[in-house]
Amino acid sequence: MKKTFETRKLYFGFPVFFLGYKDDVHGYNITTSSSAYSLGSMMVIGMRTKGNAVTEISKHGHFTVNIPREHLLEEVEIAGFNSRKDKFALTGLTYTVGETVDAPLVNECPISIECEVVELVECGKLTNIIGKVTRRVVEEDLLDEHGDFKGSEFSPISYIGDGSGRYYRYYNDHAIKMGSLIKKKKDLEK
């Protein structure tokens, strides 16, 4: 039986990423987030309106999404808990500037996505940054011989929890290709 559950927030398993942006004070910077989704060539990020990232991204019009693996968890926390500081200096992470945007790609992350701002939508104390994906880069070990993404082999950090506690979770090796269960069912019905 289900029960009404009162909480200020609920995170039901979102990938953790470094949001990269040009920063007038530090040159280039990052912050940690887990509020994003992507559809086709659109990327939407949710952030606090008064945060440094929203201020700088609204000025410069570019950002990157950099997806770390589990071994960067300490850097994830450092970048997420130190507001308005030089996160590259604090974490020891390195970057290169994107080819299509003036924002940093975190070298230690196996996946980076370059985005150009299309629109900023304020919703109370939060801002949705809507961007157009201009370039995606992926470590070669995550591409097969045809250049296709080996999604079943990538294990991002997942963020899950509620107002009383939040946790990092990791994927296991179990992966099922989308559509394979329907195909199997149809094959059995033949």
Residues covered by each model-derived region:
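Basic, polyanion-binding surface patches
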Residues: M1-K190
